[in-house]
Amino acid sequence: MANAWEDPIYRGLLAKASEATDGKVDKLCIGCHTPMGLTTDSVSAQGADKVHIAGIGCDDCHSMSASTGTGNGSYVLTPKKYGRSLKFGPRDDATSPYHDTAYSELHTQSEFCSTCHNVTHPFNRLPVERTYDEWRDSPYASADIQCQDCHMTPEPGVTKNPGKAAIMGPEREHVYSHRFTGANVTLHKHFGQDEMAERALKLLQSAAEMEFLSVPESLQAGESASVGLRVTNVGAGHKLPTGFPEGREVWIDLKVTDYTGAEVYRLGAVKDGHTEPGTKNFKATLGDSDGNVVEFAVWEADRVLSDTRILPMGYSDANYEFVIPTDAEGPFTITADLNYWGFAQSTLDKIVGENKIKSEIAKMATISHVVPVSDLRAQTK
């Protein structure tokens, strides 16, 4: 969150969006990437910032007193009351010598996050991002598991974090972690934040599981084969993946190798900076008024062309058909990797310039199965 304004990918997109819309989207975008920058009029979509300013900081969240709805920056900031600084938070017994304090139930609810994690197209009302709605309609909401319960813990699966919220504060049974772990491995790596990149990877790896549904009992050269896979969203309280659709992609990279390790079949490789045609991926794709795919220019989108993302606690199956080459020798190993990136490298190059930022591929899960040969021609190697 601290990188929300300095994110060069976002800044590149914002500059393009501002130019294309004659500045009409500037305040909408800036409002959720640096509320302080918006309210002080100290930043510019074109990069001419008046001061160096952070993205989402302490004052932004703890000045929020209410929301006017969901999405598009629908927050209300009350940094002062009766001429005194005021901070809101989840404790009804909080005190501070530096400012007044007020209890806010909103800070414990997903509705707090909804103010920016639903995004609606400002011109045609297209639902561009619906992370909050995805959670609201999920079993997690029914079980009273809030966004904060996953993204404000020390690591996946840790529900209690005892300690002090401030140096002079009392010991608490649970203190919310303010690392705000998400899935942006690429940005953390770009900024040299290796620890945060590792946290992001752990969160991704806790989100999904993969299993074989069917594999051949045996194989031989020249034989047809089929493989069935299932990917289950076991840990994300929203669709997998979620967020802006111009880049977020999860996909299966399936490889079959012979006894030497040489590939005899593959589908799901990255070629020319994007996943190859036919790849089983999980992604939302937007389109313009003519039905053309919108790669990253969200301001041109007016429809959702497809959405293959996996629902919370849902699953998606994939089936593969292939033929083993006639000169291949077994045994054969089938390996499936479940990968994620925030942007395809080819898209990233168009936004920030070629080879400026490397799009990190995060391996979320991997499974493999060895298939023996099925005839007497096989040799033990």
Regions found by a protein language model. Give the residues of each.
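Primarily the internal scaffold of c-type cytochrome electron-transfer domains
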Residues: 2-17, 44-300, 306-312, 319-324, ...
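Conserved, well-structured interaction surfaces
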Residues: 26, 31-43
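Exposed beta-strand face motif in extracellular beta-rich ectodomains
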Residues: 330-334
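Local sequence-structure signature of Cys/Sec-based thiol-disulfide redox active-site neighborhoods
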Residues: 23
